[in-house]
Amino acid sequence: MSSIFKEGIYDTGSYARTGTLDLNGIQIQTPIFMPVGTRGSIKSLTSEDIDELGYNLILANTYHLYLKPGKEVFDHFQGLKNFMSYKKALLTDSGGFQVFSLASLFKFEDDGVRFQSHIDGSHHKFTPASVIDMQRSIGSDIMMVLDDCAPYGSDTKRLELALDRTHRWAKESFAYWMENPGGQNVFPIVQGGVNETLRLRSLETLQKIDFPGIAIGGLSVGEPRPEYIRILECMAPHLDKSRPRYLMGVGTVVDILEGVKNGIDMFDCVLPTRNARNGQVFTSKGKINLRNESHRLSDSPIDPQCECKVCKTYSLGYIRHLHKVKELTAFSLSTYHNLFFMQSFMEKMRKSIEIGNFQGFYDHWKNLFGS
């Protein structure tokens, strides 16, 4: 039984459920969406903004924080939370995915992965123990193990090799973490691409280890949505009910709907913040491109039904103008709105599960945001 998670209410027609995460006394209601503060900041927002928006759990990236500002800085400041004046809970990924996708060169070894920084070409090595040590210095409440995320389209041989590494490194990470767990938790990462047999093998292997939660990686990395849904559906009946389930890097409205329907509790993605900076915002009527000429004279808010301070204060026409002339305020206003939308969306989703109307909620939002 996970000591950090308490189940709530189950939807009778799917695997959707509510629950409560307890991370060192900070209560987080699930299903939850986590904004991404890759380098220790939610781009264009302050830590006060994040608190005002009601987010009790955010994500940061070990790879980027390891390179800049580095472990020494976090040891000096006693963690990222103190460094960025953030008071709530923090999750960090292990940095493995960024090594494979960003590093100019990388090479697998039995005990880890060597890579060159995408910033200056300097040489580094991640091992299961070193990424735990880095995340201890960051001070995250939930840490991730080092894993091997095979690219979408990999053949069975490559996927099996990734599973072997991922499982071996997960066991090493667990043993190392257990020497000094402190107040931090660590999740393993299920891999296997879009191969159902390998996904179930990975899930079974990792759930046999007494990790406090489980993460699912390697989805929403380029596969068609039917493949994404198929893998979620194959795993859903086998997910341990006592542990929180985290689907990594997933954050579109439709993908979250499919995830929750199949028992996922936690999501993160850069999409709401990145889209906001590019002039795309989410509303109760679907997506809006703020730069469209049709909004030039609009004195309406982004979303008349939205209660955020941006929609209560500024017109769509004004925010469009800020984007068109590339004012930095455009980024902060649009990002604030999108994260308010995501927080409200997840709150309404939890309510729909509690009152037995998840299917109606699912149908409504899927119709608005795409098939």
From Swiss-Prot:
Enzyme class label: transferase
Cofactor(s) recorded in Swiss-Prot or TrEMBL: Zn(2+)
Binding site for substrate: D93, S94, G95, G96, F97, D147, Q191, G218
Binding site for Zn(2+): C306, C308, C311, H337
Cofactor binding note from Swiss-Prot or TrEMBL: Binds 1 zinc ion per subunit.
Keyword terms, alphabetized: Glycosyltransferase, Metal-binding, Queuosine biosynthesis, Transferase, tRNA processing, Zinc
Biological process terms in GO annotation: queuosine biosynthetic process; tRNA-guanine transglycosylation
GO annotation, cellular component aspect: cytosol
Superkingdom of the source species: Bacteria
Catalytic activity as recorded in UniProt: 7-aminomethyl-7-carbaguanine + guanosine(34) in tRNA = 7-aminomethyl-7-carbaguanosine(34) in tRNA + guanine
Metabolic or biological pathway, per its Swiss-Prot or TrEMBL entry: tRNA modification; tRNA-queuosine biosynthesis
Region (RNA binding): 249-255, 273-277
HAMAP family with a match to the protein in the record: Q_tRNA_Tgt
Function: Catalyzes the base-exchange of a guanine (G) residue with the queuine precursor 7-aminomethyl-7-deazaguanine (PreQ1) at position 34 (anticodon wobble position) in tRNAs with GU(N) anticodons (tRNA-Asp, -Asn, -His and -Tyr). Catalysis occurs through a double-displacement mechanism. The nucleophile active site attacks the C1' of nucleotide 34 to detach the guanine base from the RNA, forming a covalent enzyme-RNA intermediate. The proton acceptor active site deprotonates the incoming PreQ1, allowing a nucleophilic attack on the C1' of the ribose to form the product.
Name of the featured protein: Queuine tRNA-ribosyltransferase
